[in-house]
């Protein structure tokens, strides 16, 4: 808590992707990625940031942690996160045409974001509504199904889904 009620704590992470065909101005802003199709970037955010955040929450909850940054100090949690992000990364690279090396940098950026001790995020908040997160078009089930459609077995996503179900039962 901060003495100033208007104080807002933010993180240095940002990503600004704009559909270039919708942009009428010839002016190009620094730090903005102009793309023809936003859908791969929307999926990348869902299958990397959202799936990753939830993976840390459910893995961390099982280990008894209360915050995301606290859970990220546990090598077991980080190993599970990396494994899940590499599985979803295979899908994003195959489907969205992302460069493998660039996607690896994106994964590292996400991991660094979750390790930020100055942005405390409660696992209880991130892990709430587990049934919604197991929806057909959500962060776990959709990439799991789509990975099997390209003959990839999503072992770590399945393991995380088990953790979500375990959390649901408590």
Spans of features found by a protein language model:
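Substrate/ligand-engaging "lid" and interaction regions
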Residues: 1-169
């Amino acid at each position: 808590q901060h003495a100033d009620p208007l104080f807002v704590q933010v993180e240095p992470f940002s990503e600004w992707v704009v559909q270039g065909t919708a942009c009428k101005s010839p002016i190009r802003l620094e730090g903005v990625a102009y793309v023809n199709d936003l859908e791969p970037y929307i999926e990348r955010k869902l299958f990397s940031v959202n799936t990753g955040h939830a993976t840390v929450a459910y893995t961390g909850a099982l280990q008894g942690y209360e915050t995301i940054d606290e859970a990220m100090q546990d090598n077991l949690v980080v190993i599970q996160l990396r494994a899940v992000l590499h599985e979803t990364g295979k899908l994003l690279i195959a489907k969205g045409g992302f460069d493998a090396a660039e996607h690896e940098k994106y994964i590292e950026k996400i991991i660094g974001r979750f390790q930020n001790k100055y942005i405390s995020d409660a696992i209880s908040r991130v892990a709430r509504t587990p049934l919604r997160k197991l929806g057909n078009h959500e962060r776990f089930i959709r990439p799991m199904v789509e990975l099997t459609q390209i003959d990839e077995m999503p072992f770590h996503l399945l393991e995380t889904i088990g953790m979500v179900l375990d959390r649901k039962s408590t």
